[in-house]
């Protein structure tokens, strides 16, 4: 399966159903009153975290997501049905961005509200009053929220295996877990992150084999640089280093990877690190291990052979010990700060601009909402639009800019001819 970890999507919640104008028409009911029902709400769009997914590939082919619209109200005060919600599965670890602002971090297998459906419009029954017993007033349903979003996947793994190409990371992942990562005796066998489940007695954790890193990976060199972001999610970083070759220098390899991680993100240096000295079955292994321990006497190091699966239990014990310490550290530092989805628009300034000779456009979210919400289906509704535009300062703004009589004023798809008559 192709690995995709960043996509752009267009999300659109459902429009609310329209309210209607209706009056009772029944036998033996003289002058029946208003009974127009409200429209149903538009459907919401949710992202659902799914541990069974590990790529955003589905959005690569289908990047438009929309929920159903609500139905219009009906006579006899019958409400329209609500639009069906759209629930989309995404991998755990998916970050949702709107204009570079993080609005959701999908880290749990639950539903995250991404776009709210519009409210249903009110029918004329809702406008009945002592002064107006037979209102010919109703509202259209509100538009659902619509956003252009960027999804970024950062693999959720407890332990990240990092190292130079051909260090044996894929072989180790296969030996430790149920994964079946491709292995071969050449560089860059692993082209995308591979996940596996590591079990040790009654404990378990996820482990990720990340593509091999080379010098200046943090600056974009090699294949591994584009996957460095996945390391940020890990709680423990495990350096897999080839100690079994006379052509490789384990100390230099470790220092190279350490520098790239630091250059990419300073916070990675603060995570627990363990050195996995691989290829203990080779003759030169002991010599290289001795040199490394002399250079870094305090670093935790475990000698193993991924190929022959030697000393893996000791490695598992060391990993889970470090994970436990990392989890305790996280608990002591954690601050409850769930990301709230609150996409706010700029302050709503009332503006007017000239489009052409005798054609002007009003720009304001509030004003646009008025003309979208109130249908021009009755004289009462037209008067209502007129009063609201006046209260919002539209007419005063038009006068201030000396717009000539008879000029066309556009507000979205709504337009009228300007007259200064009260």
Curated annotation (Swiss-Prot):
Q: According to the UniProt record, which cysteines are disulfide-bonded?
A: none
| Record carries keyword Acetylation | no
| Residues binding Mg(2+) | 170, 190
Q: Which GO terms describe its biological process?
A: ribosome biogenesis
Instruction: Identify which cofactors the protein needs according to its UniProt entry.
Output: Mg(2+)
Q: What is its EC number?
A: 3.6.5.-
Domain named Obg: residues: 1-156
Q: Which residues form the OCT domain?
A: 342-420
What coarse category fits the chief subcellular location reported for this protein?
Answer: cytoplasm
Give its localization: Cytoplasm
Q: Provide the GO MF annotations for this entry.
A: GTP binding; GTPase activity; magnesium ion binding
| Domain (OBG-type G) ranges | 157-324
Q: What GO cellular component term, any one, is given?
A: cytoplasm
What are the UniProt keywords, alphabetically?
Answer: Cytoplasm, GTP-binding, Hydrolase, Magnesium, Metal-binding, Nucleotide-binding
Q: Which residues bind GTP?
A: 163-170, 188-192, 209-212, 278-281, 305-307
Question: Record's SUPFAM superfamilies?
Answer: Obg GTP-binding protein C-terminal domain (SSF102741), Obg GTP-binding protein N-terminal domain (SSF82051), P-loop containing nucleoside triphosphate hydrolases (SSF52540)
Q: Which Pfam families match?
A: DUF1967, GTP1_OBG, MMR_HSR1
Q: How is the quaternary structure described?
A: Monomer.
Which protein family is named in the record?
Belongs to the TRAFAC class OBG-HflX-like GTPase superfamily. OBG GTPase family.
Its job = An essential GTPase which binds GTP, GDP and possibly (p)ppGpp with moderate affinity, with high nucleotide exchange rates and a fairly low GTP hydrolysis rate. Plays a role in control of the cell cycle, stress response, ribosome biogenesis and in those bacteria that undergo differentiation, in morphogenesis control.
Q: What is this protein called?
A: GTPase Obg
> Could you read off the lineage of the organism from its UniProt record?
Bacteria, Bacillati, Mycoplasmatota, Mycoplasmoidales, Metamycoplasmataceae
């Amino acid at each position: 399966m192709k690995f995709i970890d960043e996509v752009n999507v267009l999300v659109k919640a459902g429009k609310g159903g329209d309210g209607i104008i209706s009056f009772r028409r029944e036998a033996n009911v003289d002058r029946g009153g208003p009974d127009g029902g409200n429209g149903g709400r538009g459907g919401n769009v949710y992202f659902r975290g799914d541990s069974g997914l590990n790529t955003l590939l589905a959005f690569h082919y289908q990047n438009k997501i929309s929920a159903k619209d609500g139905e219009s109200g009906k006579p006899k005060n019958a409400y329209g049905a609500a639009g069906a919600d759209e629930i989309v599965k995404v991998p755990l670890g998916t970050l949702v961005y709107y204009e570079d602002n993080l609005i959701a971090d999908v880290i749990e297998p639950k539903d995250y509200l991404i776009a709210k459906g519009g409210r249903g419009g009110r029918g004329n029954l809702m406008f009945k009053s002592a002064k107006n017993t037979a209102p010919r007033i109703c509202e259209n349903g509100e538009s659902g929220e619509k956003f252009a979003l960027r999804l970024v996947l950062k693999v959720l793994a407890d332990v990240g295996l990092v190292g130079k190409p051909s260090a044996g990371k894929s072989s180790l992942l296969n030996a430790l877990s149920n994964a079946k990562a491709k292995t071969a005796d050449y560089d860059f066998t692993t082209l995308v992150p591979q996940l596996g489940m590591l079990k040790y007695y009654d404990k378990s954790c996820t482990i990720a084999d990340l593509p091999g890193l080379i010098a200046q990976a943090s600056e974009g060199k090699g294949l591994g640089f584009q996957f460095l972001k996945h390391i940020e999610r890990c709680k423990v970083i495990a350096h897999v280093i080839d100690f079994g070759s006379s052509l490789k220098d384990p100390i230099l390899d470790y220092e190279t990877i350490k520098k790239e991680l630091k250059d990419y993100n300073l916070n990675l240096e603060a995570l627990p690190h363990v050195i996995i000295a691989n290829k203990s079955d080779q003759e030169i292994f002991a010599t290289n291990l001795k040199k490394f321990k002399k250079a870094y006497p305090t670093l935790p190091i475990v000698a193993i052979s991924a190929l022959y699966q030697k000393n893996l239990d000791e490695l598992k014990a060391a990993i889970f010990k470090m994970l436990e310490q990392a989890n305790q550290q996280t608990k002591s530092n954690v601050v409850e700060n769930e990301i709230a989805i609150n996409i706010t628009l700029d302050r709503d300034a009332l503006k007017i601009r000239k489009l052409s000779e005798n054609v002007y456009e009003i720009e304001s979210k509030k004003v646009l909402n008025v003309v979208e919400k109130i249908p021009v289906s009755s004289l009462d509704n037209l008067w209502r639009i007129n009063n609201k535009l006046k209260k919002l300062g539209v007419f005063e703004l038009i006068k201030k800019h000396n717009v000539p009589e008879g000029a066309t004023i556009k507000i979205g798809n709504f337009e009228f001819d300007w007259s200064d008559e009260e």
